[in-house]
């Protein structure tokens, strides 16, 4: 094996300066080959040693024979990544397992191996590909780039477990379909622009007018929940009296219908995936009634979502601790936990979770360890700090 690695290192005139070969390599029995990830200043490569040249990967950058073996070096392109997943299935994203899940947004596309190293000591499911269209635009990357960076982090680290890929804060169909077709396993639907928050500011006269204008579907949904009250197992009250329910239906029913449409687009191609409902960037704190209505109505329509991100009180900025009253946060979280626990089948999600050290223990305790936590700002800021220090 050492001789193979030395032979690869001597090919620097093609691969570029300072090639780094990841020593563990990977056996591929189906090809009678051994594969080595190679990282250079020119890019990322796959070096494949075998008895004869294989036509499995595309566009070899370099091929040479060493005694009775052939080494072919291929660029680590997205098409070659897809081919590689036929032999290394753990490079394909998977839905959540039963553990709490932890999302690590790698905005630079360079630190997935470090994220995996940091998480491996803990019983959490790693979601190491996680970016939103907004972040992609700012960093000039694509969903394919993000997934490719995560896969390289797995090869680099030697990680053999499962991982998730989250198309985060999706707001339009084009982004959803792109991530779906690339093989993402998680889709976070951002409903901040789908909820009609103006309904909560309507006066009695306007609400009465909107009630008279309701279509048949709105009337049917309103009638199903009208004047119902629930006492949840944790003592939390959910009040769906008419005066509270009407603005709730007017505000959240369009979001429910949007989720239903997007869900069926995903189901057209995917048999298993994680769906997250994102309310955290909405205009108001998510009430237990809003959470209850969304979750109940989605389940009634057969939509199997895996997590929901309410908007909590306080300020959540990336890369700094929580700003707000921790007791108020704890009380609000308790009501959300009560709804999720009684309805069942999904976990609570905390967005902009980077460096929220003061509320991590609260979130873990109140959710009973069943949660999803999203981070992204910290690793990016640490990268900037390293560049500033070295350059």
Regions found by a protein language model. Give the residues of each.
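Active-site capping/gating regions of soluble enzymes
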Residues: 1-149, 155-157, 173-195, 200-204, ...
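A generic local structural motif
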Residues: 151-152, 277
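N-terminal glycine/serine-rich phosphate-binding loop of ATP-dependent small-molecule kinases
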Residues: 164
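Conserved, mostly hydrophobic/aromatic
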Residues: 168, 277, 351
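Active-site cores of enzymes that catalyze phosphoryl transfer or operate on phosphate-rich substrates
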Residues: 190-196, 201-259, 317
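Short glycine-centered, acidic/aromatic-flanked micro-motifs in structured strand/loop junctions
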Residues: 279-281
